[in-house]
Amino acid sequence: MAGRQTGWSQAALLQFLLGMCLTVMPPIQARSLRFVTLLYRHGDRSPVKTYPKDPYQEEKWPQGFGQLTKEGMLQHWELGQALRQRYHGFLNTSYHRQEVYVRSTDFDRTLMSAEANLAGLFPPNEVQHFNPNISWQPIPVHTVPITEDRLLKFPLGPCPRYEQLQNETRQTPEYQNRSIQNAQFLNMVANETGLTNVTLETIWNVYDTLFCEQTHGLLLPPWASPQTVQRLSQLKDFSFLFLFGIHEQVQKARLQGGVLLAQILKNLTLMATTSQFPKLLVYSAHDTTLVALQMALNVYNGKQAPYASCHIFELYQEDNGNFSVEMYFRNDSKKAPWPLILPGCPHRCPLQDFLRLTEPVIPKDWQKECQLANDTADTEVIVALAVCGSILFLLIVLLLTILFRMQAQPPGYHHVADREDHA
């Protein structure tokens, strides 16, 4: 009996202590999503330009060149629906302006893509319907003029240092060899299109035109065989690498994609230290925007981002209170977003590690880093000369003032103090 009583007392004591611990210790918080940033490309569009011998000129396209098509609108509406499903329980099912902020480049196709996306993401509820026959509500999309956009329109410029890096890239063996290997092919394309300047850097225009025409069921010219179009596609992908890589990728990133990445990291850090809105920040932009960002992150797959593709940043608060970042890339509407792994970090990357690993591509002063070394030195010399000139000018003014006052004193007797005056 005594042994049983002792065992019972120990069990009761353990239960009592466990109850006390649960009372004193705060409950463990489950891992939770705190903030999402999206960067997506616009949807299907008409060609941005064409070539002189193209039988399909601008009047062939209902809204002209570079405009979002009905297919593009549907692509983004479907992406909005997919995002609505992915973030069910995180975002409100109806639009709340405090939760969402959308910024777009100032192009019709990106603005309209954002609007179509929001229509899929936030269909109006009963209270938000302004017309019972219209299942849509206006949601603001913010932008700045193209000439002032230093966040989403790439490549950023003017930037003399970046142009210098591009000139150096043209001298690399990879670029030179690619030019030699494709010289005859580029000449053929120039002859068939009527273009006078077809290079590795401009060939994407030809591919883009043919791709858009083929996508919309237009008959391609005989010279644009499947093999030719495939080769054009490969050179188009090379032109993206030329913009942001091949040579001095980190330096290029500091002047290009690192600018956007810096803003994204700033937002992630802010959301980890405050509980402010919004929950969702959206950027509507271009394939070059996605390439610039992904090259800065060193996660680019070497292929042009398809229409309505979407790079996702998700900020989580772990059960221990720390924060982590996960990235995904949705480049196929029929598949789940593909996990992206920042080199040197697991997919669930601690926020502090994410910041540390990306620091080399974050510019400290973009304007200053864009200047050439000689320009910086010349500026310093000019400033020094300006300072010296100002000092010399002040000395001359002071000297002239003294001389003027001396000459202004009237002639006659002047008292001269002797020693007794200072006794």
Swiss-Prot record:
Q: Which residues lie on this side of the membrane: Lumenal?
A: 31-381
What residues make up the catalytic site? H42, D287
Per the UniProt entry, the disulfide pairs are: C159-C370, C212-C310, C345-C349
Cellular compartments per GO CC: lysosomal lumen; lysosomal membrane; lysosome
Q: How does it sit in the membrane?
A: Single-pass membrane protein
Which reactions appear under catalytic activity for this entry?
Answer: a phosphate monoester + H2O = an alcohol + phosphate
Predominant localisation class: membrane
Keyword Transmembrane helix in the entry? The reply is yes
**What keywords are assigned to this protein?**
Disulfide bond, Glycoprotein, Hydrolase, Lysosome, Membrane, Signal, Transmembrane, Transmembrane helix
Task: Give the Cytoplasmic compartment stretches of this protein.
Answer: 403-423
Please give the start and end residues of each transmembrane region.
Answer: 382-402
Which Gene3D superfamilies does the annotation name? Answer: Phosphoglycerate mutase-like
What's the PTM story here?
A: The membrane-bound form is converted to the soluble form by sequential proteolytic processing. First, the C-terminal cytoplasmic tail is removed. Cleavage by a lysosomal protease releases the soluble form in the lysosome lumen.
Give the highest taxon in the source lineage. Eukaryota
Signal peptide range equals 1-30
Glycosylation sites per record: N92, N133, N167, N177, N191, N197, N267, N322, N331, N374
What's an example Gene Ontology biological process for this entry? skeletal system development
Which PROSITE patterns does the record match to this protein? HIS_ACID_PHOSPHAT_1, HIS_ACID_PHOSPHAT_2
Say if the entry is tagged with keyword Protein transport.
no
Note the SUPFAM superfamilies from the entry.
Phosphoglycerate mutase-like
- What EC class does the entry list? hydrolase
Q: Name one GO molecular function term.
A: acid phosphatase activity
Q: What is this protein called?
A: Lysosomal acid phosphatase
Q: Which organism is it from?
A: Mus musculus (Mouse)
Q: What is the lineage of its organism?
A: Eukaryota, Metazoa, Chordata, Craniata, Vertebrata
